[in-house]
């Protein structure tokens, strides 16, 4: 079944909006704005958040802490039901969970813009689902879009958990990986509805094996990156400065850095082979994105981890993973 050009372009718009959410979320984390709104889905009880402290009641910190405590209790009860008693206990007994930040207009509006990006992406996906039901109704496409819509709802709900638990690091990691799953499904949908024949896709076993290997290593790299980020969050709580982070980071950081060289070697070989024999454009894109990713990684390691570079590092990693997924989809087709 062939879709209209408008529908195909709209699916790319949905994907870009999801990427915007990843970018905004990374910027929120980098800027320390995650608790800029202490409640969810509203921000300080309003759909449009305040800009001045005078717009809030005198006891706003106590009031929102009480709301968060109730949500934490519900989440911990859920964790206990699914057998994660120790995790629930750790969250309940962690005093940092119950620290309520003072109002900061810059942080509040940074987090609010992040939520607006999520709202736009979610509604674009809902419109996409309605469009499919109205004009196409192909079973596979409807299932993919419906699944992504459900995952987007779960992602939004889990965002409220991240806020309720005062940014417990592992909850932020799950929040990110849910976004990556949503991106993966959207890419698969785009691959399925595309009628364009991809030129130069290598069909030999070496390419298929190497593309799988690079994809898996890159995914593992992103997991290691989240572990490094969680370690940094712990260092921040302990009072370490940016200049001290690198020397305090443990084995995950060194493995993360070492695996980068492995990805570079493998993708450089594919890039060389592609220029010589295949002329498949996505290998070139993956190679250039990896170069940008490695550049930001070096900047993080040797320039005391500047905040905006942290955001760029995650965004390039997400783009690289997406291009590698598209390569795999092309190879399977």
State where each predicted segment sits.
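Membrane-interfacial catalytic/cofactor-binding modules of polytopic membrane enzymes
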Residues: 221-263, 268-272
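Aromatic-anchored segments of alpha-helical transmembrane domains
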Residues: 23, 150-158, 218-224, 289-299
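Individual transmembrane alpha-helix segments
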Residues: 61-123, 252-256
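Membrane-interface helix-loop-helix junctions at transmembrane boundaries of multi-pass membrane enzymes
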Residues: 132-146, 271-286
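A juxtamembrane structural motif centered on a specific transmembrane helix
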Residues: 188-210, 326-333
């Amino acid at each position: 079944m062939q879709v209209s050009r408008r529908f195909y372009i709209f699916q790319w718009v949905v994907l870009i909006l999801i990427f915007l959410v990843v970018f905004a979320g990374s910027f929120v984390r980098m800027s320390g704005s995650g608790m800029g709104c202490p409640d969810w889905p509203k921000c300080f009880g309003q759909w449009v958040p305040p800009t001045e402290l005078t717009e809030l009641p005198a006891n706003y910190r106590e009031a929102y802490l009480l709301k968060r405590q109730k949500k934490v209790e519900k989440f911990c009860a859920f964790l206990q039901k699914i057998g994660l008693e120790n995790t629930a206990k750790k969250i309940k007994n962690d005093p940092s969970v119950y620290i309520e930040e003072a109002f900061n207009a810059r942080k509040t509006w940074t987090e609010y813009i992040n939520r607006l990006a999520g709202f736009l992406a979610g509604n674009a996906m809902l419109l996409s689902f309605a469009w499919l039901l109205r004009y196409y109704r192909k079973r596979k496409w409807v299932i993919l879009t419906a699944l992504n819509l459900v995952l987007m709802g779960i992602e939004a709900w889990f965002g409220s958990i991240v806020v309720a638990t005062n940014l417990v690091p592992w909850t932020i990691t799950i929040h990110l990986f849910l976004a990556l799953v949503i991106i993966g499904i959207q890419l698969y949908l785009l691959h399925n509805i595309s009628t364009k024949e991809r030129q130069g896709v290598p069909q030999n076993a070496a390419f298929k094996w190497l593309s799988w290997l690079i994809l898996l290593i890159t995914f593992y790299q992103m997991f290691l990156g989240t572990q490094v980020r969680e370690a940094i969050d712990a260092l921040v709580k302990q009072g370490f400065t940016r200049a001290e982070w690198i020397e305090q980071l443990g084995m995950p950081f060194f493995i993360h850095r070492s695996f980068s060289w492995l990805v570079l070697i493998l993708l450089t070989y594919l890039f060389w082979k592609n220029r010589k024999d295949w002329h498949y454009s996505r290998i070139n894109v993956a190679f250039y994105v990896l170069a940008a990713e490695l550049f930001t990684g070096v900047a993080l390691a040797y320039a005391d981890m500047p905040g905006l570079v942290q955001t760029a590092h995650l965004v390039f990693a997400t783009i690289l993973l997406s291009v590698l997924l598209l390569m795999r989809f092309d190879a399977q087709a």
